[in-house]
Amino acid sequence: MGGMSENTPRYASGVALVNVVISGEHAGTVLDAWFPAPSLTQTPDLSIADELEDLAVEHPARNARTEVRSASINLDEAPEDAVDAYLRLHLLSHTLVRPNELNLDGLFGTLANVAWTNHGPVLAAEFQKLAIGLRKLGHLSVSHIDKFPRLVDYVVPAGVRIGDGDRLRLGAHLASGTTVMHEGFVNFNAGTLGTSMVEGRISQGVVVGDGSDVGGGASTMGTLSGGGKKRVSIGERSLLGAESGIGIALGDDCVVEAGLYVTAGSRVSVLLPGQEARVVKAAELSGVSNLLFRRNSLSGAIEVLPRAKNTVELNEALHLN
């Protein structure tokens, strides 16, 4: 899960405010880590440490304390622990590295399952016994129970609009000019590389090129479940129509018709001017530019034909964030 460099080791570092379980069988478990200013340097900048120390206190109601830690990691090696993992997620969401350009192998195993409350993170396994004490602090709400927090509680990317903060995980990579509408979803180690409209799902490992549109309810197949190894991506100026989906890479200037799901094993008829139609697996067209994928309304067959280098144009006014 994530790319690795064959050249000189790449490093990153930062200073974090870390929530840690105080006592009990889970003592020492890291609940989260917030890196206000991560950087691609081997040595962390400690200038922010004193300011963070003012926030280092105990939270008995959560059975947690906050403490300041520094971290320096090799991006080409697997995460060693939760603080290491959180630094990698912050690097992605600060757009310091792109999806698939750092090693995330084993990241899930380093993270605790957390109840994300309005009073701060609580270990999910301890939530029930801590609930009374938490309610004594005032109104108690839990946004979700997951290993990943919401992106917007840790990083607010520059130049983007987000309709619903609950639908973006920390580790999402949103380039300036991106608009994520209310039904859009972006997983960690996934996202946009330029100006894009996102009204559908961008799964783990998937990147969307500049000027492309993921239509309402559209989806992209990731590699987290099902054993998939082939990475799905969307090139520049391409469109996934509403309720469509892909399990292959789209090149530049491509369109997938609304409601059509193209998997790697889909049998598609290639229609070229002056030639007989031939049937191939969609995987053979992965990454090819200037294609239109559609479903024949009479036969139901999936067809693909060239688009004569037409482009998808986004409304510029919608992306001046």
From Swiss-Prot:
Binding of Mg(2+) 1, residues: D166
- The record lists Mg(2+) 2 as bound by E183
| Subunit-level organization | Homotrimer.
Q: In which pathway does it act?
A: Amino-acid biosynthesis; L-lysine biosynthesis via DAP pathway; LL-2,6-diaminopimelate from (S)-tetrahydrodipicolinate (succinylase route): step 1/3
Q: Read off the InterPro entries from this record.
A: DapD_actinobacteria (IPR019875), Hexapep (IPR001451), THDPS_M (IPR032784), THDPS_M_sf (IPR038361), Trimer_LpxA-like_sf (IPR011004), Type2_DapD (IPR026586)
One example of a Gene Ontology biological process annotation: lysine biosynthetic process via diaminopimelate
Function as written in the Swiss-Prot or TrEMBL entry:
Catalyzes the conversion of the cyclic tetrahydrodipicolinate (THDP) into the acyclic N-succinyl-L-2-amino-6-oxopimelate using succinyl-CoA.
List the catalytic residues: E199 (acyl-anhydride intermediate)
Q: Where in the cell is it found?
A: Cytoplasm
Q: What is its EC number?
A: 2.3.1.117
The family assignment reads:
Belongs to the type 2 tetrahydrodipicolinate N-succinyltransferase family.
Name of this chain's protein: 2,3,4,5-tetrahydropyridine-2,6-dicarboxylate N-succinyltransferase
Top enzyme class of this protein?
Answer: transferase
Q: Which GO terms describe its cellular component?
A: cytoplasm
Q: Which reaction does it catalyse?
A: (S)-2,3,4,5-tetrahydrodipicolinate + succinyl-CoA + H2O = (S)-2-succinylamino-6-oxoheptanedioate + CoA
